[in-house]
């Protein structure tokens, strides 16, 4: 089984799920990690990386995938100061290469990272899940930020892309992004990638961009990685084997017109990292994240996994957002990153993969 199963871990003191817990989940070999206290634009120092490496290696895991080294806003906006932050990013790549890192997941979304309107939405069976209610996403970004910050303040839990430091300067950020059109954002992404590709080759590290979540413009901000055409443009814009994708089935399938399995088959050789997430759609455009089992949503998890299997996928894969189960809830669990549903998702994914392996063996006779 060539694919490598990973688990996103937020670090000691920052994640209720311990490395000891993860060690007990069959099939997990890789910890997907980051230095979550580092702000975009800062250099990840050797001693900081070493501390996390020692923790991960003590449990026999590899640390091949980083999610994420965030891109500074000056790079996305295209300010004259961007070159300084690009140099810092290059140094991060060099430092990470000393620890065997092979893939850096990142995104190029303006201001916000992922966006949801309810972090613990009841789904009817006693569990909760991340939920997106389209009517709540108006032009008033402050109410959305206030909602996320209420969890940060009450439970002392920060969320990637919604850090208090960023939320404190939202008005300033929106003003800075005001002149940035979608085409300008594409230009700035290309500039960034062309600048770092030589370093990626030097260090043998693939840059793997995550699709925009959700895959449409919000709060008047442009989004780039939203559909198959955008992915085609991205990969041809910088046609380099180190310019890759973190293909997120859930982010893309928030728009039911996106056929994730087709995208996998077309670009499998440029997918370095796969996120497997299931989505349940509502007729009004709302969506709720669902269990990984195929019939629990409309992503087509079996067809997505079949596409990876048929392509001989040898990259890294992890269960993406799961539901919060049993005693998990606000204060005891990161929204979407509970222990139980992701562990269940892994076993489902591995079961599908094992069956596909068996079917291939039977065909060979």
Protein language model regions, located:
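An N-terminal, globular interaction/scaffold subdomain
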Residues: 45-68, 85
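Conserved beta-strand edge residues that scaffold enzyme active sites
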Residues: 36-37, 70, 110-111, 214, ...
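Extended, charge-rich helix/loop segments that form flexible
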Residues: 111-188
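Catalytic domains of carbohydrate-active enzymes, especially glycoside hydrolases
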Residues: 11-36, 55-59, 95-104
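Glycine-rich, proline-tolerant flexible connector loops at the mouths of alpha/beta enzymes
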Residues: 34-50, 219
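Acidic/aromatic-lined carbohydrate-recognition and catalytic surfaces
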Residues: 65-99, 103-122, 127, 134-145
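Non-cysteine beta-strand/loop elements that form the S-adenosyl-L-methionine
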Residues: 28-34, 64-66, 106, 209, ...
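Histidine-acidic metal/acid-base catalytic patches
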Residues: 1-6, 11-13, 54-57, 74-78, ...
């Amino acid at each position: 089984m060539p694919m490598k199963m990973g688990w996103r871990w937020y670090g000691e003191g920052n994640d209720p799920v311990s490395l000891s817990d993860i060690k007990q989940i069959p099939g997990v070999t890789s910890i997907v990690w980051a230095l979550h206290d580092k702000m975009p634009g800062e250099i990840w120092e050797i001693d900081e990386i070493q501390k996390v490496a020692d923790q991960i290696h003590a449990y026999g895991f590899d640390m091949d995938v980083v999610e994420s080294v965030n891109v500074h806003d000056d790079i996305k906006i295209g300010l004259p100061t961007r070159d300084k932050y690009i140099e810092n990013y290059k140094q991060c790549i060099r430092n990470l290469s000393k620890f065997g890192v092979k893939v850096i997941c990142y995104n190029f979304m303006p201001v916000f990272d992922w966006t949801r309107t309810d972090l613990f939405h009841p789904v009817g069976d006693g569990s909760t899940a991340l939920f997106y209610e389209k009517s709540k996403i108006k032009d008033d970004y402050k109410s959305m930020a206030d909602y996320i910050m209420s969890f940060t303040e009450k439970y002392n839990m920060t969320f990637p892309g919604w850090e208090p430091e960023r939320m404190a300067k939202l008005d300033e950020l929106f003003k800075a992004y005001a002149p940035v059109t979608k085409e300008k954002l594409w230009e700035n992404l290309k500039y960034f990638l062309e600048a770092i590709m030589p370093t990626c080759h030097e260090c043998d590290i693939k840059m793997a961009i995550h699709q925009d979540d959700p895959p449409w413009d919000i709060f008047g901000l442009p989004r780039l990685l939203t559909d198959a055409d955008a992915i085609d443009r991205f990969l041809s814009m910088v046609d380099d084997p180190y310019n890759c994708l973190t293909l997120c089935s859930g982010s893309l399938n928030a728009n039911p017109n996106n056929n994730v399995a087709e995208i996998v088959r077309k670009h499998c050789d440029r997918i370095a990292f796969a996120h497997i997430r299931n989505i349940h759609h509502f007729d009004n455009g709302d969506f709720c994240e669902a269990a990984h089992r195929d019939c629990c949503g409309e992503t087509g998890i079996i067809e997505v996994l079949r596409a990876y299997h048929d392509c001989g996928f040898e990259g890294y894969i992890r269960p993406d957002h799961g539901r919060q189960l049993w005693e998990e809830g606000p204060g005891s669990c990161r929204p979407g990153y509970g222990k139980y549903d992701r562990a269940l998702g892994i076993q489902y994914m591995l079961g599908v993969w094992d069956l596909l392996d068996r079917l291939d063996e039977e065909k060979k006779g």
